[in-house]
């Protein structure tokens, strides 16, 4: 660790921030030509449950910063609208609209099906298998009863794919509640990966520690054919001062516009407009109980952030698909009497301005795609850290 900390002190901004400057990265309007990079090598990637491509984007940026090119051998998602956004941003990727269970078996011990055999022949020497299985079944933001959701079984696809492709590294991202699933799906997946020869580590991290301007805890699992990867050591190496809402979106205030869907605020109901006005007239950030709807005045609602106003000088609360509505969380703009725009939510999710959401044609699609996305800074940090360890010979 001391060697890593010395390296951190010597080249701090280059290491911990994308392109050495996270804010410059977020405000970049021109997409890098990842496909034309003059590279010293390439990295092969399979991204299951890829969504709009937050994990892929972070890996491309990490690889590019180290002079490497990424070949996306396979990207799969069941959400066609999210996948259209992915394809628009990563045209060279082999992206497939499909339920992963239509491609992979969920039982790691069953014989390979025809599609798995074909993929095994075409994808070899894989570097990274990554994925964030749908988390609705065990999200900390949902009721306990939803931990029974059948989607939890999709975790096992990650172990199945690891057995088929034999990647050097497997990275799984999800909410912390996944670890407490009553069926032990997370721990069982970790054990399956161990059984097929991987060293497995997992930790819960808060993304504001690595510069994402929101309070967003994630459970990270890394399985490695090489030495055990110390996740906390990587996070410590890339740790930054928490980034605030002001840092992320202040420059977008002048884009409050009716011209583009990304910068178009939602229209609140008359009641919610009154609540927003009350927050600003009284210069407060939490709506008093008597100003809330009757159903939220009772004692069974513990989320005080609902109907709240964001603080300029703090990270935002977790961005979800409900960011357009104040009744879904603390999503009222700190300085303007409205909720967040899609552009602002994307910034808080650490998506740069060059990333196109043009294929999301409706407000609902935008909210779902942005709210469900994985902030690219997470995969940037994890993969950049792993690649540097490889370059130093610490992952063998």
Short names for language-model regions:
Residues 1-20, 25, 43, 267-396:
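C-terminal target-recognition/interaction regions appended to catalytic cores
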Residues 48, 129, 238-241, 338, ...:
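Short conserved micro-motifs on helix faces and helix-strand junctions that flank
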Residues 111-114, 118-126, 136-306:
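Class I S-adenosyl-L-methionine
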Residues 70, 213-215, 243, 313, ...:
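A short, structural micro-pattern
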Residues 53, 80, 156, 183-187, ...:
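A structural signal for well-ordered alpha-helical segments within the folded catalytic domains
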Residues 21, 25, 31-50, 54-165, ...:
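Core alpha/beta nucleotide-donor-binding catalytic domains of modification enzymes
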